[in-house]
Amino acid sequence: MPKSFYDAVGGAKTFDAIVSRFYAQVAEDEVLRRVYPEDDLAGAEERLRMFLEQYWGGPRTYSEQRGHPRLRMRHAPFRISLIERDAWLRCMHTAVASIDSETLDDEHRRELLDYLEMAAHSLVNSPF
């Protein structure tokens, strides 16, 4: 049986690292910080980590706790323009780039980034 993407890239440890490094940047980014209504980003960090782990073949904790992901619906209340999309992608690219190539080889890195870019583009809901 082939390994899932989740297992192939180191499982929870890798996704924890990506998401924690991403949110460390979000906390300091004036564009993105406005998108998050909570003062504490821990809840958002946990939700993204659970979502990514599930999407890539890990535990189904996200769906068990929150139901179907419905990304567009869950992000609809927030104004997401090209500016927010680009800031999100910049932070996510930096977080993914911080993972060593033994853990996240070029093929898996590209697959992950392709998905993240597609998802970010699909969530844009405002021209401004």
Swiss-Prot record:
Has UniProt tagged this entry with the keyword Amino-acid biosynthesis?
no
Where primarily located? membrane
Note on how the cofactor is bound? Binds 1 heme group per subunit.
Which metal ions or organic cofactors does this protein require, according to UniProt? heme
What processing steps or modifications follow its translation? Contains L-DOPA (3',4'-dihydroxyphenylalanine).
PTM 3',4'-dihydroxyphenylalanine: list the residues.
36
The record's section on CDD domains has: TrHb2_Mt-trHbO-like_O
* Cellular location(s): Cell membrane
For this UniProt entry, the molecular function terms from Gene Ontology, in alphabetical order, are:
heme binding; metal ion binding; oxygen binding; oxygen carrier activity
Q: Which Gene3D superfamilies match?
A: Globins
Annotated GO CC locations: plasma membrane
According to its UniProt entry, one GO biological process term is: oxygen transport
Q: Where does heme bind?
A: 75
Enumerate the Pfam families for this protein: Bac_globin
Q: Which residues cross the membrane?
A: none
| Record-listed cross-link Isodityrosine (Tyr-Tyr), residues | 23-36
Could you say which protein family the record assigns here? Belongs to the truncated hemoglobin family. Group II subfamily.
Q: Which PANTHER family match?
A: TWO-ON-TWO HEMOGLOBIN-3
UniProt protein name: Group 2 truncated hemoglobin GlbO
Organism expressing this protein natively: Mycobacterium tuberculosis (strain ATCC 25618 / H37Rv)
